A protein has these predicted regions:
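Flexible hinge/capping segments at coil-to-helix
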Residues: 4-22
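Short helix-initiation/N-cap motifs at beta->coil->alpha
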Residues: 9, 26-28, 42-56, 90-91
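Secondary-structure junction motif
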Residues: 12, 22-37, 66
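Residue-level signal for nonpolar/aromatic packing positions in well-ordered secondary structure
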Residues: 2, 17, 54, 95, ...
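Short helices/loops that flank or line small-molecule/ion binding pockets
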Residues: 15-18, 36-37, 48-68, 75
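Beta->alpha turn/N-cap motifs
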Residues: 5, 25-29, 46-47, 63-73, ...
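Periplasmic-binding protein-like
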Residues: 1-4, 66, 70-113, 131-135
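Ligand-binding clefts/hinges and TM-proximal coupling segments of bilobed small-molecule sensing domains
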Residues: 29-42, 81-84, 107-135
Length: 135
């Protein structure tokens, strides 16, 4: 996702980053995406510093993982920031099991599917991240 100040409506896509200041970790994939879009990169240590630079007006945007951004927004509801663009990237998540634990994996997957079907995962997602990240 691309994050900007809440009041900034000029960035609505990756193309809009061209020539703009984007606060990014130097070696992150998000930084590579910003550079590929033509953004001027302001090197930072991580997401919190990126968002601080945006709030201070020293950067105009940052690209980062939606889950990390939603977590920040949940902890800082009055940050004055918004998700300006969400390209809908899906980053697969997996749970680790020991090899040969097929019965456990089957039970786990069934339980996870039941929680998804009855809406429990959606409720947990909204409670902890303020958005439905189960889709």
């Amino acid at each position: 996702v691309i994050v900007t100040k809440s009041s900034d409506n000029s960035i609505k896509s990756f193309e809009d980053l061209k020539g703009r200041k984007s606060a990014q970790s130097a070696t992150s994939n998000w930084g590579k995406d910003a550079k590929a879009a033509g953004a001027q990169i302001l090197v930072v240590d991580g997401l919190a510093q990126s968002l601080e630079l945006i709030k201070q007006g020293r950067a105009e945007a940052t690209i980062n993982d939606k889950l990390a951004v939603l977590d920040y927004f949940k902890q800082h509801p009055n940050a004055g920031l918004k998700i300006a663009y969400d390209r809908g990237d899906k980053i697969p998540t997996a749970f680790a099991f020991l090899q040969g634990e097929d019965a456990l994996i089957t039970k786990f997957n069934q339980a996870l599917e039941a929680l998804h079907q009855d809406g429990t995962l959606k409720q947990i997602s909204i409670e902890w991240f303020g958005d439905d990240i189960t889709q």
